[in-house]
Amino acid sequence: MTAPAEPATKSERSFPKPEFTDAEAGALEFPSSGSRSYNYFTPAKLRATTYEDVTFDVQPDPARHLSQGWIYGFGDGPGGYPHEWTALKSTDWHKFRDPNEEWEQTIYRNNANAVRQIQQNLDNAKLADAYNSWTPAWTKFVERNLGAWMHAEHGLGLHVFMAAQRSAPTNMINNAMAVNCAHKLRFAQDLALYNLDLSESLSGFDGSAHRAVWQDDAVWQGVRRNVELLTAAGDWAEALFATNVVFEQLVGVLFRSHLVMQIAARNGDYVTPSLVGSGEHDYNRDLGYSRALFALLTRDEEHGAHNREVLGGWLAKWVPLSIAAARELQPIWSQPQERTIPFAESFEAAKSGLRSVLADLDLDQPEELNR
């Protein structure tokens, strides 16, 4: 009888044993070591909003957390988002918060609501044959002038804000300008679709007339020149200031609010004001963040005087240009059959709006506004 076999011995795996020491970063005391919450920024209020959580510090900055410096850049220029891309200065660009608190969800929600409302209005207008009540003079006015304004909105969205929203030093600013860009492009698209709708629904409406008006009509060449010069502005803050503060107040609000929305109903048109009103609502939101940003810069403890001087120079450059563009639009005030407000009154209201904005920003009013 053979002896029982010895059981096979198990081979033990060799791996290093963990050693716990107090010599590493875990043993250090930080200001937030005892905190039960985590925040890498100081919120504007007691608690951080969702807007701040998803927007703040998304864009890197060597002054905050990016201790190794810029990790990418352009082949023919500096890395990242240099502060030198604008003549304005700030002790802390990260102080800016968009008063509209726009982030991904609100962008989709707000624009979807606007498009839905406009589409419902257009559908209702077709069902009610609302366009048949338009006067011939008003039909021609919309055909030529509202169509021409579409080019201004598209140019500002695609060539001013599309470029500017990549240039500011913080994501909070760039995000606000990106939403501004979306507003302009959506409104331009709304006007284009409205033009197609009228071409199909309104007999005698020439849906292609706006091209010749924008390119050749002397009345619109001042606006066109102003828009094209805005697209060439290299300083992102100058482009934003000259567009949202100067051009929009003196030309945009003048045309949209003080002309189209004032006289459309008297000419049998209740549809166009609802469309143009959505664009005016967008601008009011965009003016809100612009005011907040430039007020922060003009009241900067260290650079406020410098910034007011720079902005004053931009006013001297852009206000005469926009005033000239506005005055060249004067003949279209006499085109509709029913007119309720003279150009001088509309223009004075537009200039009053600009004066109010400049007062909020602690900026001196240019002499041209009093002429």
Model-derived regions, located:
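Acidic/His metal-coordination segments adjacent to aromatic residues that form catalytic metal sites
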Residues: 124-145, 205-245, 265, 304-308
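Terminal targeting/low-complexity segments that flank the catalytic cores of oxidoreductases
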Residues: 1-152, 300-371
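Inter-helical turn/loop segments and adjacent helix faces that build the functional surface
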Residues: 162-176, 194-203, 230-238, 257-278, ...
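Long, hydrophobic, well-ordered secondary-structure blocks that form the structural core
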Residues: 136-216
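Alpha-helical bundle segments that constitute or directly flank the non-heme di-iron/ferroxidase center
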Residues: 56, 61-63, 136-168, 234-262
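Alpha-helical scaffold segments in carbohydrate-active enzymes
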Residues: 176-197, 250, 278-293, 321-324
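Hydrophobic packing residues in well-ordered alpha-helices of helical domains and bundles
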Residues: 146, 177, 241, 272-276, ...
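Extended alpha-helical coiled-coil scaffold domains characteristic of the BAR superfamily
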Residues: 150-153, 184, 233-259, 280-286, ...
